[in-house]
């Protein structure tokens, strides 16, 4: 029941399973996923000491090979002497530091210090490597014990265990040839032929040593040697060496492909002719739930212009989260993505919206020249920009034309089983993508420029427009200030005028009131009936007229 539910969940929610990346909408603008892998990070390395014994044990054929051995020693000296000088130059200037406490009882080792004045010029990488070199070096007693053990061994690979120390692996690349071919043939071959055979073998071995340690001649302190290169000096049997080193992790192939196993020179002996290496082989830690997706894009046409969507080549998903992924410190293998450090960093919200299906959030740029893919095979279907390249149905011989309203053409077996595109013949499968992606149904993102010259030109134009906008804003501010001052002045004038009008109006009203008051008094005196004139001796007619 649980298995059935899980199957239904995968079928019904494909985008949820793939980390919320909407592959359906992305395919409409020419972006498809070409693979997914787990994410693993290298953790703290384990260290193992390896000794390359450059001088084989030739006790059984010593009488026939003296000349060849002397010439071989001379050649080895030209390689080992510069490395020895460089190692001594930095190791002799590294001294231990004691604790600063005065108590003898509490005095202890506190670390190491580099005598910079005596050393002179050294880079930060050389100083760091020099400190690590000092910490991995064997003491004099251990070196002498190692010399004695190497002189007595005649095995190609020998495990040497010293008292109180870890196992040391000693390797001699020519010893098997001497033991298995030259020594048994001593009775059938003359002494000269044995010497010549050994001389040729030693010369070839010297060439391998020179190619291996040649780059270390310039900077033997910080130079690292990969285990692949080291295998040539170990006789070519890398599996046996790794087995002897005790490494049997399931991620061995991934670590080898990512070149995670490194070796550094810690000691060179130019008398006994051997080199001591410190080999670091890391373990891997898988970050659960993180999936790395690889993306590829196909260009598409809008009219006569060819565009492609600008998305990163790799992205990482963890549940609903989508992050950018820096593939610089990483290697890709069938076992997953192996990184020497954390390669995830945040993604902008706009780009996250693009991956979640909002095509209007996906920026696009013009195709310059012949840059960009014009077709890609995904889920057995051919996604092609048939407006820019010739698409032909190989089965029928007809040309597959692209509708001007379409930005891409999706070809499956129902349309043409065998397709010839840009001179390549491809057999396609059943339809997985609908061939109905029209321009008017897609919201395309904003156009941007990725070319350095175009970006610089656009930035210059933007700065110029900003300066002009600033000047216009300053002018508008000045106009606003002028209008503000003028409005204040006009308001004052209006208020003064209104005050004067009000005063004049009050005066006029006052004068009118006084005049009316005087007129009313005069009329009262004339019309008062209590005052009668003296009419004595006046005729009746006159009185009547009055």
From Swiss-Prot:
It is a single-pass type I membrane protein; Single-pass membrane protein. The chain crosses the membrane at residues 492-512. Pfam families: Fusion_gly. It is found in: Virion membrane; Host cell membrane. Disulfide bonds join 330-339, 354-362, 386-391, 393-416. It comes from the Viruses. Residues 1-19 form the signal peptide. GO terms for cellular component: host cell plasma membrane; membrane; viral envelope; virion membrane. The inactive precursor F0 is glycosylated and proteolytically cleaved into F1 and F2 to be functionally active. The cleavage is mediated by cellular proteases during the transport and maturation of the polypeptide. GO terms for biological process: fusion of virus membrane with host plasma membrane; symbiont entry into host cell. Residues 134-162, 458-483 form a coiled coil. Glycans are attached at residues 25, 57, 63. Residues 109-133 are annotated as: Fusion peptide. Keywords: Cleavage on pair of basic residues, Coiled coil, Disulfide bond, Fusion of virus membrane with host cell membrane, Fusion of virus membrane with host membrane, Glycoprotein, Host cell membrane, Host membrane, Membrane, Signal, Transmembrane, Transmembrane helix, Viral envelope protein, Viral penetration into host cytoplasm, Virion, Virus entry into host cell. Its main location: virion. The record marks 108-109 as: Cleavage. Gene3D superfamilies: 1.10.287.2480, 6.10.10.110, Head and neck region of the ectodomain of NDV fusion glycoprotein, Newcastle disease virus like domain. The keyword Membrane applies. Residues 513-546 are cytoplasmic. Residues 20-491 are extracellular. Homotrimer of disulfide-linked F1-F2. Belongs to the paramyxoviruses fusion glycoprotein family. Class I viral fusion protein. Under the current model, the protein has at least 3 conformational states: pre-fusion native state, pre-hairpin intermediate state, and post-fusion hairpin state. During viral and plasma cell membrane fusion, the heptad repeat (HR) regions assume a trimer-of-hairpins structure, positioning the fusion peptide in close proximity to the C-terminal region of the ectodomain. The formation of this structure appears to drive apposition and subsequent fusion of viral and plasma cell membranes. This is Fusion glycoprotein F0. It comes from Rinderpest virus (strain RBOK) (RDV). The gene is F.
